[in-house]
UniProtKB/Swiss-Prot annotation:
Pathway: Carbohydrate biosynthesis; Calvin cycle. Mg(2+) binds at D233, N263, I265. The record marks H103, H340 as: Important for catalytic activity. This is Transketolase, chloroplastic. It comes from Solanum tuberosum. Catalyzes the reversible transfer of a two-carbon ketol group from fructose-6-phosphate or sedoheptulose-7-phosphate to glyceraldehyde-3-phosphate to yield xylulose-5-phosphate and erythrose-4-phosphate or ribose-5-phosphate, respectively.
Length: 741
């Protein structure tokens, strides 16, 4: 438990944002390392995002700024801290009020911990939000995003100017209603659905622990940063938070510090109506160090002491339970659910201004507060310069490790990496695509330094084990096999955090395809936040057989095809599996799902890595003039059925084109000319076959075509029997082809 004794700021100099005197970097040459600035290789910026200029600091400037920073911190008094905290509160109040939408309660209650983190503890460079060795901050209770926006504004981030605060939650605003990493530089991950943020934070901390174990040397600590997260009662109630916090404790993520905003208020009222567990005891049982800050409203020294204590614990994550008052300072709405999700209203805003002694106009930042916070720009630039110099020395001593780390940071793939992908011929033995996937996973792990992942307790069924590596565990964090246990939702969100840590970290995760239902929330956020996770989903159809309809996906292909910014692959054999992996590795802003078979499938003639990359392509065709009698379209295990049906139709004198539709989304990206060459508009006789829902297939088969599939649940029986009973056969395809042609 945190000590209640009073501590001065000079007694708690644990802030990593202060350059150290006598640092070796002062005499080290400046490293011009543009790819590390987060500009040319910035992984998580949309095309409309502004490029942020790199800041360079000379040796002399560095020394002056370092001295000034220490002097400023030592002279900081309670008055400027209180004024800064109230500035944060009123920026949040004013933005919500102007937007007539938002959540002022959390920012008002959490402003003290937010201030201490951003002003006294965290290391970051406001002018380069993507500096690699920065501390990461995650607001898991994303509805309180005005807290983070106010902090970014005060800290000097270009992404949150006064005009941005005034356009909160408006069309085209850079500060949307919940934090979005692709909209606001300085926001690490996209949060909003409660529990996702704490899970992302675990992923960020996993990435730091893994990279530190691999690349740090006794004489060079090149990876050294913390992950801080604020979560609320709602996050605690969500099951995903328990999943990931269990793993965080098991893995001993000592550089993960979570602040639990313990305000006892939910949307429906006091948490007593539905949430009465002992959260501290639960976290202790999960292997966390737990501290209780009893006065989160004004107990600044208590918060500082708690952070200092947390940083002293190296072998486990820390939860700091901070008891706060939601809407602190509001005379009539504080400690009430009414301040959670709506503005205070003009009268209550005025009352709050009077109560907290705030005479300023809306959105005003007092000059002494501006001056106090202005040091973070030079300090941050100095920190990055110091790290760049340290990396330059590291690169001289450890060239191979430096090259791998640089690849991970920048996302620049090693030259010729794609040559590692296996290729197959029709003479290659038949195999399940889950087994072929494992061959690809292991091939990629040999050539991609940032490739890592695991399964939700199904590694031996999903075939996801990296054979040349051990398990990532508390004492072996340098290894690359992640054991997630039966925690699908947590697994997905942790991988989002890993992917968003560094562009060259390429995480994959696996379970049975049907159990994506347990992790869909994380997968949607992956697509939204442009996190290039690879989802290895096996047992992709009724082909899994006897386990029955609880384990047989039906609607899943269609549902993911409806989701924006995600690639839904269903490869038919080895070449298509390799093609899917090639695209998945290259598409770092788009997650990919590989739906893979349990049953063995033949290596088909005509398939290719290049064809799979186009999403849909011609596998075989005995017609001329781009006008076959009928086009058969198959995916995955049913491409073999389409090929067999084509052979039967050819025997009857038909000209038949077989098309493999590996990925609808990639096919849609192709030119109109290419699509016309594959599915000519003049040929309306089309039949699709897929062991799943027929929903959406009309787009490709047209009104005159026919989609063969399954629009009900499956059954428990041997796979061959189920295929026959559901009409997923070559005979059914032949009959349909004759009907439409």
């Amino acid at each position: 438990m945190a000590s209640s004794s009073s501590l001065t700021l000079s007694q708690v100099i644990f802030s990593p944002s202060l350059p150290r005197h006598g640092s070796s970097s002062s005499s080290s040459p400046s490293l011009s390392f543009s790819t590390f600035s987060g500009l040319k290789s910035t992984p998580f910026t949309s095309s409309h995002r502004r490029i942020l200029p790199s800041t360079t600091v000379t040796k002399q400037q560095f020394s002056v700024r370092a001295s000034a920073a220490v002097e400023t911190l030592e002279k900081t008094d309670a008055a400027i801290v209180e004024k800064s905290v109230n500035t944060i509160r009123f920026l949040a109040i004013d933005a919500v009020e102007k937007a007539n939408s938002g959540h002022p309660g959390l920012p008002m209650g959490c402003a003290p911990m937010g201030h201490i983190l951003y002003d006294e503890v965290m290391k970051y460079n406001p002018k380069n939000p993507y500096w690699f060795n920065r501390d990461r901050f995650v607001l898991s209770a994303g509805h309180g995003c005005m807290l983070q926006y106010a902090l970014l504004h005060l800290a000097g981030y270009d992404s949150v100017q006064e005009d941005d605060l005034k356009s909160f939650r408006q069309w085209g605003s850079r500060i949307p209603g919940h934090p979005e990493n692709f909209e606001t530089p300085g926001v690490e991950v996209t949060t909003g659905p409660l529990g996702q943020g704490i899970a992302n934070a675990v992923g960020l901390a996993v990435a730091e622990k893994h990279l530190a174990a691999r690349f740090n040397k006794p004489d060079a600590e090149i990876v050294d940063h913390y992950t801080y997260v604020i979560l609320g009662d709602g996050c605690q109630m969500e099951g995903i938070s328990n999943e990931v916090c269990s793993l965080a404790g098991h893995w001993g993520l000592g550089k993960l510090i979570a602040f639990y905003d313990d305000n006892h208020i939910s949307i429906d009222g006091d948490t007593e109506i539905a949430f009465t567990e002992d959260v501290s005891a639960r976290f202790e049982s999960l292997g966390w160090h737990v501290i209780w800050v009893k006065n989160g409203n004004t107990g600044y020294d208590e918060i500082r002491a708690a952070i200092k204590e947390a940083k002293a614990v190296k072998d486990k994550p820390t939860m700091i339970k901070v008891t706060t008052t939601i809407g602190f300072g509001s005379p009539n709405k504080a400690n009430s659910y009414s301040v959670h999700g709506s503005g205070l209203g003009a009268k209550e805003v005025e009352a709050t201004r009077n109560n907290l002694g705030w005479p300023y106009e809306p959105f005003h930042v007092p000059e002494d507060v501006k001056s106090h916070w202005s040091r973070h720009t030079p300090e941050g630039a100095a920190l990055e310069t110091e790290w760049n110099a340290k990396f330059a020395e590291y690169e001289k001593k450890y060239a191979e490790e430096a090259a791998d780390l640089k690849s991970i940071i920048t996302g620049e793939l090693p030259a010729g990496w794609e040559k590692a992908l296996p290729t197959y011929t029709p003479e290659s033995p038949a195999d399940a695509t889950r087994n072929l996937s494992q061959q690809n996973l292991n091939a990629l792990a040999k050539v991609l330094p940032g490739f890592l992942g695991g399964s939700a307790d199904l590694a031996s069924s999903n075939m996801t084990l990296l054979k040349m590596f051990g398990d990532f565990q508390k004492n072996t964090p340098e290894e690359r096999n992640l054991r997630f246990g039966v925690r699908e939702h947590g697994m997905g969100a942790i991988c989002n955090g890993i992917a968003l840590h560094s562009l060259g970290l390429i995480p994959y995760c696996a379970t049975f395809f049907v159990f994506t239902d347990y992790m869909r929330g994380a997968m949607r956020i992956s697509a939204l936040s442009e996190a290039g996770v690879i989802y290895v989903m096996t047992h992709d159809s009724i082909g899994l057989g006897e386990d029955g309809p609880t384990h047989q996906p039906i609607e899943h292909l269609a549902s993911f095809r409806a989701m924006p910014n995600i690639l839904m692959f269903r490869p038919a054999d080895g070449n298509e599996t390799a093609g899917a992996y090639k695209v998945a590795v290259l598409k770092r802003k788009t997650p990919s799902i590989l739906a893979l078979s349990r049953q063995k499938l033949p290596q088909l003639a005509g398939t290719s890595i290049e064809g799979a990359a186009k999403g849909g392509y011609i596998v075989s065709d005995n017609s001329s003039g781009n006008k076959p009698d009928v086009i058969l379209i198959g995916t995955g295990s049913e491409l073999e059925i389409a090929v067999k049906a084509a052979e039967e139709l050819k025997k009857e004198g038909k000209t038949v084109r077989v098309v493999s539709f590996v990925c609808w989304e990639l096919y849609d990206e192709q030119s109109a000319e290419y699509k016309e060459s594959v599915l000519p508009s003049s040929v309306t006789a089309r039949v699709s076959i897929e062991a799943g829902s027929t929903f959406g297939w009309q787009k490709f088969v047209g009104d005159k075509g026919k989609a063969i599939g399954i629009d009900g649940f499956g059954a428990s029986a041997p796979a061959d029997k189920i295929y026959k009973e559901f009409g997923i056969t070559a005979e059914a395809v032949v009959a349909a082809a004759k009907q439409v042609s």
